[in-house]
A protein has these predicted regions:
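Nuclease-adjacent, charged terminal/linker segments that flank catalytic cores
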Residues: 1-88
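Solvent-exposed, charged helical/coil patches
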Residues: 77-122
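Polar/charged alpha-helical tracts
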Residues: 14, 66, 87, 91-94, ...
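Short, solvent-exposed polar/charged micro-motifs at secondary-structure junctions
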Residues: 145-149, 200-201
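Catalytic cores of nucleic-acid endonucleases
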Residues: 158-222
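A short acidic/basic microdomain associated with nuclease active sites
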Residues: 120-147
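Surface-exposed polar/charged interaction patches
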Residues: 22, 95-99, 223
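Active-site beta-strand-loop-beta-strand hairpin of nuclease catalytic cores
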Residues: 149-156
Length: 224
C-alpha cells in the first residue's frame, strides 16, 4: 500500500498526551505477555508501524487502542493484520499453547507496539513544535530502526531495557549498525526513556529529555 505522510505532521503533542484510550495491555503482566515466544517476536508482513501509520493517515488524528481494534476487523483491512494475527494464534495452539495463552501474548505484542507508536508520534510532534523539521516514514521505522529523522540524523527512541535495547546493549540492532554507521554519511542519536513505575499509560519522555535531544539535533544539523 502506498504511504504518504501528511496527518503525522499535523499532530499536536498535548492532544496525544491527553488521548483517552483503554489500557492496551489489558490486565496482563509480562509473564503472560511474553509466554509465547513466536508471538513475542512476531513481525507481521505489514509492520506494526506501517499498519498504525496507515490508520492514522486515514483518520487524520491519533487514535485510541479500541479504535484501532475496531478498524482492524473491517473487511478491507483484515488481510493487513486481523487474518495473519489469527494465523499466529493457530500456530501457537498447534505448538502446545492454549488459545488463551496465545491470545494473551498477541494482546501484549499489539499493545506494546501501539504504545511505542503513540510515543514516536508524540516525539515527532514535539520536535516539530520546537522548530525541528522532524520526519517520519514507516519503512524507515520498520527497516532501519529510525523512529524519526532530521536532515541526515537518525533518531531512535527506546525504553531502557537490557533485554531489548539500552543504548547499544540488547537484542534489537541499533540504526547505526543497520545503516553502516558514520561511514554512511549519516549521524545517529538516541533518546532513551527510563522505565517508569506506572501501568496502563504510555511512557512518554519528559520535556527536559526531549528539549536536550532537540538541542543536540540542532548542533548536528548545523554541522552539515
Amino acid at each position: 500500500m502506498e504511504h504518504r505522510t501528511s496527518a503525522v505532521y499535523k499532530l499536536v503533542p498535548s492532544e496525544i498526551r491527553n488521548l483517552t484510550s483503554e489500557h492496551a495491555l489489558g490486565n496482563l503482566r509480562p509473564g503472560q505477555g511474553y509466554k509465547v515466544e513466536s508471538i513475542r517476536d512476531w513481525r507481521p508482513d505489514f509492520a506494526f508501524s506501517h499498519i498504525f501509520h496507515f490508520h492514522l493517515e486515514e483518520r487524520g488524528r491519533m487514535f485510541s487502542f479500541e479504535e484501532f481494534r475496531e478498524w482492524s476487523t473491517l473487511d478491507r483491512f483484515q488481510p493487513m493484520f486481523h487474518t495473519p494475527a489469527w494465523e499466529k494464534i493457530k500456530e501457537a495452539i498447534a505448538g502446545g499453547y492454549s488459545e488463551q495463552e496465545a491470545k494473551n501474548s498477541l494482546r501484549w505484542r499489539i499493545g506494546i507496539a501501539y504504545y511505542s507508536f503513540v510515543r514516536e508520534m508524540y516525539v515527532v510532534a514535539r520536535f516539530r513544535e520546537l522548530g525541528l523539521d522532524a520526519r517520519f516514514h514507516p519503512l524507515a521505522d520498520a527497516l532501519f530502526r529510525t523512529d524519526t529523522w532530521i536532515g541526515d540524523t537518525s533518531v531512535a527512541l527506546y525504553i531502557r531495557n537490557d533485554a531489548f535495547r539500552n543504548g547499544k546493549v540488547g537484542r534489537k540492532p541499533p540504526a547505526e549498525k543497520i545503516l553502516g554507521g558514520e561511514e554512511s554519511g549519516l549521524k545517529f542519536i538516541g533518546l532513551g526513556i527510563p522505565t517508569q513505575p506506572i501501568w496502563g499509560e504510555v511512557h512518554f519522555p519528559d520535556d527536559r529529555a526531549v528539549e536536550d535531544c532537540a538541542g543536540k539535533l540542532r548542533i548536528l544539523t548545523a554541522q552539515r
